[in-house]
Amino acid sequence: MRKILLPYPAGCATGTFVRRVKRFSVEMTRDGESVWVHSNNSGSMLGLLRPGATMLASPAANPDRKLAWTHEAMRCHGDGPQGFWVGVNTSVPNRMVEAAFHAGRLPWAQGYDTFRRERKRGDSRLDARLDGPGLPTLWVECKNVTMVEDDVACFPDAVTERGSKHLREMMDIVSRGERAAMFYLVQRPDGLCFGPADVIDPQYAALFWEAVDAGVEMYPHRGIVSPVGIDLSGVLPLTRCR
């Protein structure tokens, strides 16, 4: 059996989702007690945060942190055989792309031998810079995808001016002769293709297709989420969300 690229920390726990408060705090019940969990997801997590749904939390690496748990995943469509996990931790795509690079699991990064995270370019800081002998520098920006509508995995699930800025930056990179790639980690299994959510953020959607035409590479990889961790699967085809 192939090793999972990103195993969850030891000591993860499931509980029942109660509510979200002030965007970055989630209440769950576990063994009849209320537990507050940190969420790093600033998006809407549209359709996932249903009271009574099962959620997964990991223990904080820092024992002195105010909230002792981190929100990792939500159960969608129940706990039965039709249900599945959806990963909501937005730090996962950055860690996944690095782990996949070192494991040789990114076909579009073949030949590159150096991975540097969070590198500055101009006034921006991008998630990763890859270099290799005789190859153009490859800049990578990572996004987490949790929404699926009519079999289409969509991003974003809330208006994102920051995301639009990243697309403009990636187009500028390509115009200067370097490579630019968007790594979208679709942390759920039911998306058959991928596209920008034009109903939610028309500006981002328009810039997405402009970036495609400009030569920005789009890699919406499917993530395989389980209670023990996340693995990486293939790239979904692009489509328009209509």
Swiss-Prot record:
Gene3D superfamilies in the cross-refs: 2.40.50.580, 3.40.1350.60
Under Pfam families, the record lists: SfsA, SfsA_N
InterPro entries (UniProt xref): SfsA, SfsA_C, SfsA_N
Q: Name one GO molecular function term.
A: DNA binding
Q: Which family is this protein grouped under?
A: Belongs to the SfsA family.
Q: What PANTHER family does the record tag this protein with?
A: SUGAR FERMENTATION STIMULATION PROTEIN A
List the protein's name.
Sugar fermentation stimulation protein homolog
Q: What gene is this protein a product of?
A: sfsA
